[in-house]
Regions:
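C-terminal domain-boundary segment and adjacent tail
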Residues: 42-55, 82-83, 95-96, 214-241
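Residue-level detector of anion-binding/catalytic polar loops
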Residues: 85, 111, 172, 179, ...
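Active-site beta->alpha N-cap acidic-glycine motif
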Residues: 31-125, 129-136, 140, 146-147
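Alpha-helical scaffold elements lining the catalytic groove of polysaccharide deacetylases
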Residues: 120-147, 155-202, 214-221
Length: 241
């Protein structure tokens, strides 16, 4: 069995509107089944209650999905200027094509974790196929100094079977609690407004994406708003340590 860890139980996601919406019944069932099958596995669910699993009061984690991309180095430059470290959930086939961008992320002091090898929904795979997705990506990432590796399913799509497969392979499934909405935003100001209309609470895991120039533009104000609330910026791994 995995090492003893808390189990996140949130059933709602906080998004750009600042409202909450129930998770689909399938996701709710997955949570209940996984909770009974693997009560010691840590799963951070989309929703404000994800902060229940944070052991570091006052900290907020920035996470970036879908990299590495041609914009990765620009993200890293801005984060360095802001003196902020973040967690990058990377796509395996992109890592294989551009290992130099992965190295740059690590050399910048950031945390890297898996986001699937092909960016297909984990719920579409058999257990054997998902295991291959996890391990192929993991082999391309520097070893993490922790008992369990982090993984974020593409699109946040989970099922009882996928959660079980990830856990048995030694992966902690990490979703998010505050969605920046940058992937659908029309401009940087729209991303920035998310953080004024939905103020981040301690322990929040913020979802952002690579490949979005408007996200790069919004980052200084996003980070500034989080610091103005008294939060320290950390990696997801540090938040859950």
């Amino acid at each position: 069995m995995p090492a003893s860890l808390s189990f996140g139980t949130a059933l709602h996601e906080r998004g750009p509107s600042g409202t909450s919406s129930p998770l689909a019944s399938g996701r709710r069932t997955a949570k209940l089944l996984a909770e009974r099958l693997l009560p010691e596995a840590l799963v951070v669910w989309r929703g404000s209650e994800a902060r229940r699993v944070s052991r570091q009061p006052g900290r907020v984690a920035l996470s970036f999905d879908d990299g590495p991309t041609p914009l990765t180095l620009r993200y890293l430059d801005v984060l360095e200027q802001l003196r902020v470290r973040a967690t990058f959930f990377l796509v395996g086939e992109l890592c294989a094509a551009h290992p130099e961008w992965v190295r740059a992320i690590v050399e910048g002091g950031h945390e890297v974790a898996g986001h699937g090898y092909t960016h297909r929904r984990f719920t579409t795979f058999s257990r054997a196929e998902l295991t291959s997705e996890l391990l192929r990506t993991s082999e391309l990432l520097p070893a993490r100094d922790a008992k369990r590796q982090l993984v974020r399913p593409p699109y946040g799509a989970v099922s009882a079977s996928s959660l079980l497969t990830c856990a048995l392979q030694g992966f902690t499934t990490v979703l998010w609690s505050l969605n920046s909405g940058d992937w659908r935003a029309r401009d940087a100001q729209e991303v920035e407004r998310t953080f004024s209309t939905t103020p981040a609470s301690a322990g929040e895991i913020v979802l952002l994406h690579e490949g979005q120039p408007l996200t790069i533009e919004a980052l200084p104000r996003v980070v500034g708003s989080l610091k103005d609330l008294g939060h320290e910026l950390a990696t997801v791994g540090e938040l859950l340590a």
